């Protein structure tokens, strides 16, 4: 019933500002609100979607060979402070150096008795099912 009253209004019930719709049946008034105003951006000629504030600068590139071999560059996420110093290899866990950082292994290269084999097989089956079901019609 409220919807009938709302749409039965003068047709201009969705204006840009909040106002009240009169209820013809009684003294109850419906409050209608709309979206907030668009933010005004400074700078640029008609720059749509331009961000207000500082312009971002590219990080400085380090060319010092001593610094590059003793510190990982770009790891420090804070504005102030020094970069982390690399430790000797003996202080890191052994599994870190056994990780596969190259291309992923193929299904034929894995042993069928391992969990990685079955996970990759399941992933391949899901990909195959998705390819086949893409062409099906309703």
Curated annotation (Swiss-Prot):
Subcellular location per the Swiss-Prot or TrEMBL entry? Mitochondrion
Q: Which GO terms describe its molecular function?
A: structural constituent of ribosome
- Primary place of residence? mitochondrion
| Residues annotated as transit peptide in the record | 1-16
Q: Identify the keywords attached in UniProt to this record, alphabetized.
A: Mitochondrion, Ribonucleoprotein, Ribosomal protein, Transit peptide
Q: Which domain of life is it from?
A: Eukaryota
InterPro entries in the cross-refs? Ribosomal_mL54
Q: Which GO terms describe its cellular component?
A: mitochondrial inner membrane; mitochondrial large ribosomal subunit
Q: Does the keyword Transit peptide apply?
A: yes
Coiled-coil region(s): none
What does the record note on quaternary structure? Answer: Component of the mitochondrial ribosome large subunit (39S) which comprises a 16S rRNA and about 50 distinct proteins.
Q: Indicate the family of this protein.
A: Belongs to the mitochondrion-specific ribosomal protein mL54 family.
Q: What is this protein called?
A: Large ribosomal subunit protein mL54
Protein's gene: MRPL54
């Amino acid at each position: 019933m409220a919807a009938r009253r709302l749409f039965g209004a003068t047709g201009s019930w969705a204006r840009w500002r909040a106002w009240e719709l009169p209820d013809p049946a009684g003294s109850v008034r419906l409050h209608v609100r709309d979206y907030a105003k668009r933010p005004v951006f400074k700078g640029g000629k008609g720059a749509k979607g331009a961000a207000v504030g500082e312009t971002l600068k590219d990080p400085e590139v380090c060319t010092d060979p001593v610094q590059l071999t003793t510190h990982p560059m770009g790891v420090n996420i804070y504005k102030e402070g020094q970069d982390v110093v690399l430790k000797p290899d003996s202080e890191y866990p052994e599994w870190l150096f056994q990780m596969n950082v190259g291309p992923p292994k193929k299904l034929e290269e894995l042993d069928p008795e391992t969990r990685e084999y079955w996970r990759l097989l399941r992933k391949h089956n899901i990909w195959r099912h998705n390819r086949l079901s893409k062409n099906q019609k309703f």
